[in-house]
Structures are given as C-alpha cells and as structure tokens.
C-alpha cells in the first residue's frame, strides 16, 4: 500500500465504524460503550480509487501512566508516529469536548498532516458541532456519516488534497508504468463494480485522478444516453425510442478542452407509482446513488414536453442532496419558434425552482451535437460556484450592511439580534449565523439572507445552506479558557 492513515479521536466518536467502512468488512468491534477498541488494528483499506494502510486506535484517554487507559493512549501515539497522516474524528452531534481540544493539541504537536473528520453529521444539531470544530485549529471539518456512508467522496478529496496526488497515487502510477495496460471495458464499468466496502451498492466508484463528476439524469427517453454518445463521439450506450433502455448507471471517462470528466448516465427516473419491476426499482436506486456521488448533475428535459411533475421532483431531489444542478433543454432541433419558447422556459425555470435562483439552463440537441460546449461552460462555472469559499471578514462586513438596511424583525416584542456569520463548508456552500433566539427567526428572513448571499457573492444556481445557532462567536470559548 502506498501510504498509511491513522484514525484518532476520543472514545465513542465512531472511529471503528469508519474503520469498518474503509476496510470493507466488520473487523473492528463497534459498540456505544466507550473504550471498546483497546489495541490498534492495521488493515488494507480502500476509498474509491485510494488504496492505503489504515490504523484503528483506542479512544484517546487522559489517564495515569500505569493504567489500562494510559497503555491504550500509548498505542494511539504509536499509531500517529507510524502514519503518514491522521484522520482526527469528532462527534459533530455531541460537539467539541475538553477531551477533543486536549488531544487535538497532541495531534498538532506530532506535526503529522491532519484531516478533521466530523462524524455523525447526519444527526440533527450537527451543524453547531461542525461550527465549533474550527476552534480545534485543524482546518475545515469534513462532514461524514460513517454509519450511513455519507460524505465519503468529500473525505476522499480531503485526503488527496492533504497528501497530494503524487503521493497518494505513487504506487498506482508505478504499476501502470510497469504494465502499460489499458482496458477500455473499465471505462464503461457499472457504478460500484470495484468497491469493497460493506455497503458497496450504496456508494458509486470514483475513478482516475479527481475528474469533474457529472451525473446525467431525467425522465425516461429524455435523450440522456444520446447526449453522452455525442459527447464521447461514439455509440457507447444503447439508445432508442423505447423508454427505459438504460438499466444501470453507466460511467465513462471524457475530456473536454483539457478538463477530465467522469460522466454517469442513469436509468430514467419515473414516479414511484410507475416503478413496478424489481429490476427497474434497482435501476432507479442506482441512479439516486449516482446523483449522490456526482458533483454536478445535468437534468435533461425534453424541450417538447418540459417541466412535468417528475422533472420537478428530480430537480428537488438533486437540490436536497446538495448537488450543483444544470438544466439541458434537449431535442432543441425539434423546436420551431425557438426565441419565444426559450424565453418561456427561462421564466418557468425561475418560477418553478426558486430555491436555486439563477439556475443555469441551456438549449441543446444531443442527437446533432448542438449546444454541448455552451452546456459544459455552464457546468464548469456552476462547479466553481459550488466550491466557492468566502472569507469570514467579507461575510461579516456584508452582514453588518444587511442588518443596517433590513434588521431582523421583533418577535414577541423583542428584537432578534444577528451577531456573526461564517462559512463552515463548501460543496455546496454552507453558512452558520450566530444570533439570539434562533428558533424565533422567521424563515422569510433566512431566505432574505440566502438571497443576499447569492446576489452579493455571485452564487447563482447552487444550493446554499444556512443554519442558525446561539453563540457570540466561535472564539468565545477559547478566550474564557485563557483566563
């Protein structure tokens, strides 16, 4: 294996659950009782295209030197010294504890590169824990759910960014140079074929060296496979007038103007009432997994019959999953009064999908290859916005002006106070606002803030997450500790 990672953290934050997921089987004992893991375990692990050695450690414990807990801590410290990098795991649901802060300091002193992993991020209230995690000084937290397999693509990207592509793919590239073998069949592999984790059917494969991952979705017979065939310049995918030809999520590598792309064609997504065959149910589920794995999702609409109920349900699903959507109005060659029809489609896009104001939409003909460059320009731009980070200073200068112009309303005779804002994640952009009485804040004012962020910082067409919490600022706790 090319490199070694150590999973480190206080007891009961989910280290062994993450270990089991990455090694592909339940090798580590998992229980709610702290201290279940007493020794460090080392095993070959895989996260999409990353192959490495993984060390599971006992929960870090503060203890007397002659105690069992002290020996467990020694095992953990040995694991840190052996590893190339550390996955420091916290419980986002429980928030930051004094033990987290103590052992984060120990990890920093080791000098090893660190990915801060915010586990249990699917739980209600986890946003506050991720917000507090910045005080550990270990960088931006990577939110995941080890139990449910959520956030694994982001964890993979964080590891590559931390160690660098040359380091993490060194062994793989050496093998490729020695073998000089390329198998075209692998390009069209079914999503999830080469995954060995315990829920392989839930997590699609991630191929190559960080290409832009695009899923192409839509109702049956909207022209998804035809579009991909035109992009690739070959008949890679079966197409025809019959709805539902594509049964699986098919992946294909592509390069557009020097940019590496991973395309996923998905089975047509029907209404639940019409999904009757077991195979088709599995195909739709596979399409949902492709959406969750993708970064940008192209929603292919038949321009002759656009915006049916199912189209809007698909778009809503993509937005709720936090992906970056782009609409392709396909079969544009069949439209006669194009200027009038396009104006009508733009108006419907804005009216029917207000939750992603500024959603990019492009007319294309997948069969004739028209509009594909324009579509891809919008895909790349949307991907850049989806990854955008705004400094805390800029955010709070903007927030000060917003409050001066339109302060929050008074509720029950008391004015709500908005104190502080910071960005806690990207992909999609996520923000936390510190305020008094978050539960009393009207959703209309939250939407007002989101729309202001979108307009001021030029973030059209992507989901924006905004959470409220009670706290003066993220450094208040740190200041108190120094006294």
UniProtKB/Swiss-Prot annotation:
Family: Belongs to the TRAFAC class TrmE-Era-EngA-EngB-Septin-like GTPase superfamily. EngA (Der) GTPase family.
Any GO molecular function: GTP binding
Protein name per its UniProtKB record: GTPase Der
Binding site for GTP 1: 9-16, 56-60, 119-122
Keywords linked to the UniProt accession: GTP-binding, Nucleotide-binding, Repeat, Ribosome biogenesis
Subunit structure: Associates with the 50S ribosomal subunit.
Protein purpose: GTPase that plays an essential role in the late steps of ribosome biogenesis.
Keyword Nucleotide-binding: yes
Tagged with keyword Coiled coil: no
EngA-type G domain segment(s): 3-167, 212-387
Superkingdom, taxonomy of origin: Bacteria
One annotated GO biological process: ribosome biogenesis
């Amino acid at each position: 294996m090319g490199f070694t990672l150590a999973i480190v953290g206080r007891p009961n934050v989910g280290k062994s659950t993450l270990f089991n997921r990455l090694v592909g089987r339940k090798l580590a004992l998992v229980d709610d009782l702290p201290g279940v893991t007493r020794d460090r375990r080392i095993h070959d692990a895989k996260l999409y295209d990353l192959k490495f050695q993984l060390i599971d450690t006992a929960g870090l414990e503060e203890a007397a030197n002659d105690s069992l807990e002290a020996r467990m801590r020694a095992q953990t410290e040995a694991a840190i010294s052996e590893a190339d990098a550390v996955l420091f795991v916290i419980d986002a649901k429980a928030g930051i504890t004094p033990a987290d802060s103590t052992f984060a300091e120990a990890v920093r002193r080791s000098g090893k590169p660190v990915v801060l992993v915010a586990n249990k991020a699917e739980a209600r209230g986890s946003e506050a824990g991720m917000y507090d995690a910045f005080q550990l000084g270990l960088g931006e937290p990577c939110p995941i759910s080890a139990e449910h397999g959520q956030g694994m693509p982001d964890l993979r990207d964080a590891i590559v960014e931390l160690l660098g592509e040359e380091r993490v793919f060194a062994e793989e590239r050496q093998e490729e140079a020695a073998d000089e073998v390329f198998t075209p069949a692998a390009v069209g592999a079914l999503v999830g074929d080469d995954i060995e984790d315990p829920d392989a059917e839930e997590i699609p494969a991630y191929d190559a060296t960080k290409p832009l991952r695009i899923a192409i979705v839509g109702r049956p017979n909207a022209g998804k496979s035809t579009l991909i065939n035109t992009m690739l310049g070959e008949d890679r995918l079966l197409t025809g007038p019959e709805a539902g030809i594509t049964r699986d999520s098919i992946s294909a590598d592509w390069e557009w103007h020097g940019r590496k792309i991973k395309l996923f064609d998905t089975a047509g997504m029907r209404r639940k009432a019409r999904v009757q065959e077991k195979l088709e149910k599995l195909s739709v589920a596979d399409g949902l997994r492709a959406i969750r794995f993708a970064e940008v999702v192209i929603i292919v609409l038949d321009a002759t019959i656009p915006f049916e109920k199912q189209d809007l349900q698909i778009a809503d699903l993509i937005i709720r999953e936090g992906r970056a959507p782009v609409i392709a109005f396909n079969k544009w060659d069949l439209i006669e009064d194009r200027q009038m029809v396009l104006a009508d489609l733009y108006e419907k896009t804005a009216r029917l999908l207000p939750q992603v104001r500024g959603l990019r939409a492009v007319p294309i003909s997948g069969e004739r290859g028209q509009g594909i460059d324009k579509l891809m320009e919008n895909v790349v731009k949307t991907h850049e916005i989806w990854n955008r980070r705004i400094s805390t200073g800029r955010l709070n200068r903007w927030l000060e002006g917003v409050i001066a112009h339109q302060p929050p309303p008074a509720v029950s005779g008391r004015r709500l106070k908005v104190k502080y804002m910071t960005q806690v994640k990207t992909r999609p952009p996520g923000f936390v606002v510190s305020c008094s009485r978050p539960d009393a804040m009207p959703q209309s004012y939250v939407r007002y803030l989101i729309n202001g962020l979108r307009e001021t910082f030029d973030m059209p067409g992507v989901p924006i997450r905004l959470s409220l919490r009670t706290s003066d600022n993220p450094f208040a706790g740190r200041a108190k500790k120094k006294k």
